[in-house]
Amino acid sequence: MAKITKTFQYGKHTVTLETGEVARQASGAVIVKMDDTVLLVTAVAAKTAREGQDFFPLTVDYQEKFYAGGRIPGGFFKREGRATEKETLISRLIDRPIRPLFPEDYKNEVQIIATVMSMNPDIDGDIAALIGASAALSLAGTPFNGPIGAAKVGYKNGEYILNPTITELKDSQLELVVAGTANAVLMVESEAALLSEEVMLGAVTFGHREMQKVINIINELTVEAGTKPSTWVAPAKNTALISALKEAVGTQLAGAFQVRDKLQRRDAISAIKKDVLESLAGRVASEGWSSAELSKEFGELEYHTMRDSVLETKVRIDGRALDTVRPISVQAGVLPRTHGSALFTRGETQAIVVTTLGTARDGQVIDAVAGEYKENFLFHYNFPPYSVGECGRFGAPKRREIGHGRLAKRGVLAVMPSLEEFPYTIRVVSEITESNGSSSMASVCGSSLALMDAGVPVKAPVAGIAMGLVKEDDRFVVLSDILGDEDHLGDMDFKVAGTAEGVSALQMDIKIEGITEEIMKQALQQAKAGRLHILGEMSKALTTPRQELSDYAPRLLTIKIHPDKIREVIGKGGSTIQAITKETGTQIDIQDDGTIIIASVNAIAAQAAKSRIEQITSDVEPGRIYEGKVAKIMDFGAFVTILPGKDGLVHVSQISSERVEKVGDKLKEGDLVRVKVLEVDKQGRIRLSIKAVEEGEGVPASAE
């Protein structure tokens, strides 16, 4: 196939799509250029599904090569290793709008690999990767109901910005990524500076409108490439099996969905499934039916039973009304030795969230393609298998945990103090101890409380809520504070976090087309009412940050010295700074601009370290009297240390008003003596006198 190129203007960037020259053995491959940021995105689809495959094995891997930024990886191994957090998050960002566009019965393995091969540090690879994945899948001839477009939206001075650069985002009140087809929004991921619901919805519709040019270009590309449509045909439904199953189940599932407790409901449904499969076992054998298909169709019955029930009765499977939030319980300060903690329970979803305060050196150093930087606010989300009553793998965080942690972090970022306002590294850990839907939003609520319990000066409390949707034709219901089953069996997962003032984070995943702007508007308004209710419940535990830090949290003292004096504080080979930290038990960080941060759980020790540094950096003043220690005896006099790192000479003629024949007769090393500074010459040499003090001259150094 000859090389095909398509170029278009997208915001401030020139975007080029190329296919037919590179990676020609992949099912679909495209090079995406967004100015100087260049990605190769490939899609490969297996010709057939594996035997017994009962799920759609789609994998997406986004990777940033260090050579893209002209760098060699740091550390011992000089090659890229496992996926970074950013790579994992962008991989999920690509997966989410693509997965629902494949047919439900399609089980062939599909793999998308997006490789960043050149990176302009001001143009991120996320939007280019989404566009490339859409184009590669469209070229692959899979039964992909795309293409999709993607756009990043900023907001500044009341105006939306299409595909802002990283520099522009620093001053933007919004960073929102939206992806979807020509007719529908499928995915939204965003963080915002407490914006209104109207501004957030406007950003979604703005991005969806602008991305149409991407969809049109991809359609043109596939036509020119001569891509043949997929020949895959969905397997025919076994109507006899479905009829037999419905007859065997009867109204049992409807009854099971009236059980309000999650675990009891799960057990009731499992018992019905077991009985039905056993009752139909003979017919399955005689008719040659597939037991896997029978199990799948049972799941379809579950899906329709729950949906039909809530659409008809407007009552949910746990008995709540559509807009009712589950009962909430909150406690702050639940763990005695931590710096800040909270227990947040909402129905059958529960999180223990802990805040830890550290110094600047505790920040995480990130070795990224665009350059090394330090992260001083860390948010980690853990989802152990016991939280859903199961056994499972326990260890390194999975992609889902990284994604949920990032969403929860976005939820509280807008209210966090700057490093200048609160010079601590802050780590928040959310341990999900129970889960029945919306655990990431429970993490937002719990983290807000734990941060305030730790005394972090957040601007306002933050709460989060997950919304759902069930839609059949023109009938639809919007659900507040969804359960796990409502998420799994519903059409939308719509998470909103924010304060009473506005939205700080919005994440949306939609499984169907036909979600109108009016439906999204209703969901946002219903979410706001739920968020305000949750904030009211949270206020029963804490309304503002505690005034005092925990007794176990480090106290920070900050002093400023002239940058030229940094070497004096450090000392030869680090001897001075090491002596101070060892003797006072403190941790000391020195920045290039002369800012010194002293950290210690003991306030007295921190003050002692501060005094030592002030002594070292203070200038020796002629005419002042200091108390010093004799450091060395010489024939012509004695050297006396008057300040740390500062020695002066007492000449033999200045030791006493009487004649001194031998210095050792009057002074010994280690003696404490009071001396007056006679002179500090241009070379910094200090002349001292003991005689002048005895004669009553000079002003004590302590007299300020």
Curated annotation (Swiss-Prot):
Gene3D superfamilies: GHMP Kinase, N-terminal domain, K Homology domain, type 1, Nucleic acid-binding proteins. Residues 554-613 form the KH domain. One of its GO terms (biological process) is RNA catabolic process. GO terms for cellular component: cytosol. Its EC number is 2.7.7.8. Keywords: Cytoplasm, Magnesium, Metal-binding, Nucleotidyltransferase, RNA-binding, Transferase. InterPro entries: ExoRNase_PH_dom1 (IPR001247), ExoRNase_PH_dom2 (IPR015847), ExoRNase_PH_dom2_sf (IPR036345), KH_dom (IPR004087), KH_dom_type_1 (IPR004088), KH_dom_type_1_sf (IPR036612), NA-bd_OB-fold (IPR012340), PNPase (IPR012162). Residues 623-691 form the S1 motif domain. Coiled coil: none annotated. It catalyses: RNA(n+1) + phosphate = RNA(n) + a ribonucleoside 5'-diphosphate. It is found in: Cytoplasm. Mg(2+) binds at residues 487, 493. Its cofactor is Mg(2+). Signal peptide: none annotated. GO terms for molecular function: 3'-5'-RNA exonuclease activity; magnesium ion binding; polyribonucleotide nucleotidyltransferase activity; RNA binding. Involved in mRNA degradation. Catalyzes the phosphorolysis of single-stranded polyribonucleotides processively in the 3'- to 5'-direction. NCBIfam families: polynuc_phos, PRK11824.1. Component of the RNA degradosome, which is a multiprotein complex involved in RNA processing and mRNA degradation. Belongs to the polyribonucleotide nucleotidyltransferase family. This is Polyribonucleotide nucleotidyltransferase. It comes from Xanthomonas campestris pv. campestris (strain ATCC 33913 / DSM 3586 / NCPPB 528 / LMG 568 / P 25). The lineage of its organism: Bacteria, Pseudomonadati, Pseudomonadota, Gammaproteobacteria, Lysobacterales. The gene is pnp.
